Amino acid sequence: MTWANNIGLYQKKKYKDALEVAASKGTFVHDGIEDFIQNGNELDLDKVPPGYQKEVNFAYGSFKSWWTVISKRNVKVIMQEHKLVCPWFGGTLDLLIEIDGKVYLLDFKTSNNSSYKYFLQLAAYRYILKYYYDIEIYGCGVIKLNKKYIGFDEFIIDKSHPEYEGFMNICERTFLSIVYGFINRTLVERNYNNIFVG
């Protein structure tokens, strides 16, 4: 609520505008990460609007800090910025990576907050990877990249803890129930209109 008031009532900014700015910063960071992993290129800050450069640079630097740590292990990139689609939903995964022989599904976030909703998203991708690509995921995680200084937080859950696997299974069932609910509501509305509206 405080954040909404700060960008809305007191700062005279529209909520939608604030979301677009945040999304734009995240897009610059994601594009930089993609180019670095695929081609070894560093982020070109000259392509980033001046008002975004500081936060984008910190977030990208936070990624590089994470990458330096993870690169000390046996790492193989399987997919990056890859579109995943099934008949009912889809999205774009950030990174599917093998670390020491175990497959992890990772999502990079530049937002200031964390949410269980990130794991609903990962559960949806995990579902598609399992049933449409025959890829078994060992672990899922959110890598939160700081925009104020160089630093990152990892929110990783994997099969080494049974309660973590249980959590991901609940996330998958929850996400699928939302999808099924939407589909069924659409069918109810369509059938109602066919029967009563004509």
Task: Name the predicted role of every residue range.
Residues Q80, L95, C140-G141:
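A structural signal for short, well-ordered beta-strand segments
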Residues V85, E98, I143-L145:
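A generic structural motif
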Residues N113-L120:
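Active-site-adjacent loop/helix micro-motif of nuclease/hydrolase catalytic cores
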Residues L120-I128:
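Short, charged, amphipathic alpha-helix that recurs within catalytic cores of restriction-modification
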Residues I128-G198:
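Metal-dependent nuclease catalytic regions and adjoining charged, substrate-binding loops involved
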